[in-house]
Amino acid sequence: MENIIIQNQEKFDEKLKVIVSGGIDKLHVRMDFDGTITKAIVGGKIVPSLISVLRDEDFLGADYSQKAHALYNKYHAIEIDPVVSVADKKIAMRKWWETHFDLLIEKGFSKCHIQRALQSARIRLRDGFGEFAAMLVKNKIPLVIMSCSGMGVDMIKMVLEKNNVLFDNMRIVTNQYEWNDDGVAIAVKEPIVHTLNKDEESIRRIPDAYKTIKNRPNVLLLTDSVADITMADGAKIGTLLSFGFLNSNIDKQLGAFEKNFDAVLLNDAPMNFPKDILKNVCGK
């Protein structure tokens, strides 16, 4: 338990009791992808996202990498600035994603680049995710993966498939490219999903995803970002039990994580604790 902080044990236990009482038929799970399903630290270095692999490993040339890093430096500063309003941040995030997608298309981003990025040793699933995902599918509990990935739904599916954890109980809410016959990206479909609009509305836009969860009011929510607590905004939630993976800058971010999450998991922790909670719910 040394990597787990539960600020209010009584509240945590009360929520868990309600979820267990409701049973698996009333439960679904919502997870972020980058830094939650994937490991955030590989070989001692931070891997913030799938798109960072494309950006850092020079697959699209030096000009792309330079411009992509410049966009990150400009807009990430706005994203984490406590003085900037949420409304202004949402405008900035939309602009960041639009500009980056335009840059990717300009540089000829294709499915071949996804295949190359997929081979990167920096893309690894969080320890224990496979067992967690297998338990969900065995008990017919839906998993909604909510991601603002710049690599799109194709990359996420390929990562899961490569690791033999792409299951039919999963629904992926993220960005989608339009490809030409040669597998080259020519556009991005609306709506664009960015860091600050991953919410219930984004699920409702995908009828198949919403259908699987609409009668399952209890939620386990797992993410590595305080901003992602909004992944349940707008939903008719019964009981929400949230897990925050605090992977880096612990001293700086711990207070915010403790305030927003029922449980905080430190240092790129494995999935052991969420697995134990799920076993409890499933009666295992």
Protein language model regions, located:
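Alpha-helical substrate-recognition element adjacent to the catalytic core
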Residues: M1-D181, K259-F261
